[in-house]
Amino acid sequence: MGVLRHVVCAMSGGVDSSVSALLLKRMGYHVTGVFMKNWDSQEEKGLCSSDRDCEDAYKVCKMLDIPFHEVSYVKEYWHEVFSNLLWEYERGRTPNPDIICNKHIKFKHFYQYAVNTLGADAMATGHYARTSQEDEEVFQQKLTEAPKSLFRDRFEIRKPVRLYQGADLLKDQTFFLSQISQDALRHTLFPLAGLTKGYVKKIAAEAGFQHVLKKKESMGICFIGKRDFENFILEYLEPRPGNFVSIEDGQIMGKHKGWFTLTLGQRARIGGRADAWFVVDKDVTTADVFVCPSTFHPALFRDTLQTDRFHWIAEEPPAELVHTQMMDCHFCFNNRMPLTPCTVTLNLDGSVWVMVKEPMRGMATGQFAVLYKGHECLGSGKIIRLGPTKFALQKDQSNTNCLHKDTNQQHPEPHS
């Protein structure tokens, strides 16, 4: 009789993690369900439903007759995710807490808890994603430390595990997994890898998981709940009012409560104005937020960005990029957007420049640039610098044309 493999499944109280636990048990594994509490909602007037989610996860584990545990990462989440979120917003950036949470909480602290405390052979989550490993290969992996240099040891014989989009491309969640470590990925199972959301719901219905099936799919950030983002963020950051300024003529259009309540591309709520204006830039030194009068204004579009040191899931850049310093692939900075063709340039410090084929709307610093080659998610880097907008380039071209015109007028062609 073979060894009974122990898999710890992260339980959120939702349909995806519930079906993941069910499938793992059907595969013959010894499954333990664990609910993570990452946010203390005692002072949030019940807006974050973590208590109900925990109860729902417990009910599923009871129905499956598997052990259930609850673990708190409230302190870790505050210091490693939420504090970082506030720091980024104060500097005018637009962070992604879901990517940061997966990196630091689910695939670091929870992963270590599963392996070291519960003695798991592997962990599992309900993400719609897959890897290059067969399930049995996951159990053969050894724990190793992440490389401390830009490239891993060339003399280390270690085939990297690769992250791929799941079968349901509409629900693919590799975007949110683009910062996780190679070591955690090696020890993770994704039971929903080959399934569609519709089929997962069918499995849940047949299993009698009605209490999770009827729940609305979580969208957005849990700790904000149903509140307006501006009201939420102002509970943690002091209001810093400033002006809405037209990008076209410098006219003051109205007042705002703080640049950190706004992100590039969103509609600016300017009192007394019925027409739509959109955020195109922020100056944290003057508190000015620059706006434009159309959702398709050229000031919202740009085609170039730079990241910080890029996190390659396979621990090193693709050979093509190392050899030529340039590579064609696909890019996105928002999980709801389609993948866009781009060219990537590798810098000596490990950062990358990304140039997309067509200018894109609403890119902002603090967001993550996620790269794909085919269906493989290569990794991501935080956007630290943006190239010029179409509007800025048009102005430069206009000024250059005016300069040439003035020069020609000052030095007219001699008459023949």
Swiss-Prot record:
GO terms for cellular component: mitochondrion. It holds the Pfam family tRNA_Me_trans. It is found in: Mitochondrion. GO terms for molecular function: ATP binding; tRNA binding; tRNA-5-taurinomethyluridine 2-sulfurtransferase. Keywords: ATP-binding, Disulfide bond, Mitochondrion, Nucleotide-binding, RNA-binding, Transferase, tRNA processing, tRNA-binding. Residues 171-173, 334-335 are annotated as: Interaction with tRNA. Disulfide bonds join C101-C222. It is an enzyme of class 2 (transferase). Its EC number is 2.8.1.14. SUPFAM superfamilies: Adenine nucleotide alpha hydrolases-like (SSF52402). Residues 403-416 have a biased composition (Basic and acidic residues). It catalyses: 5-taurinomethyluridine(34) in tRNA + S-sulfanyl-L-cysteinyl-[protein] + AH2 + ATP = 5-taurinomethyl-2-thiouridine(34) in tRNA + L-cysteinyl-[protein] + A + AMP + diphosphate + H(+). The active site is at C101 (nucleophile), C222 (cysteine persulfide intermediate). Its main location: mitochondrion. ATP binds at A10, M11, S12, G13, G14, V15, D16, S17, M36, G126. The record marks H127, R267, Q367 as: Interaction with tRNA. CDD domains: MnmA_TRMU-like (cd01998). One of its GO terms (biological process) is tRNA wobble position uridine thiolation. Residues 96-98 are annotated as: Interaction with target base in tRNA. Belongs to the MnmA/TRMU family. During the reaction, ATP is used to activate the C2 atom of U34 by adenylation. After this, the persulfide sulfur on the catalytic cysteine is transferred to the C2 atom of the wobble base (U34) of mitochondrial tRNA(Lys), tRNA(Glu) and tRNA(Gln). The reaction probably involves hydrogen sulfide that is generated from the persulfide intermediate and that acts as a nucleophile towards the activated C2 atom on U34. Subsequently, a transient disulfide bond is formed between the two active site cysteine residues. Catalyzes the 2-thiolation of uridine at the wobble position (U34) of mitochondrial tRNA(Lys), tRNA(Glu) and tRNA(Gln). Required for the formation of 5-taurinomethyl-2-thiouridine (tm5s2U) of mitochondrial tRNA(Lys), tRNA(Glu), and tRNA(Gln) at the wobble position. ATP is required to activate the C2 atom of the wobble base. This is Mitochondrial tRNA-specific 2-thiouridylase 1. It comes from Danio rerio.
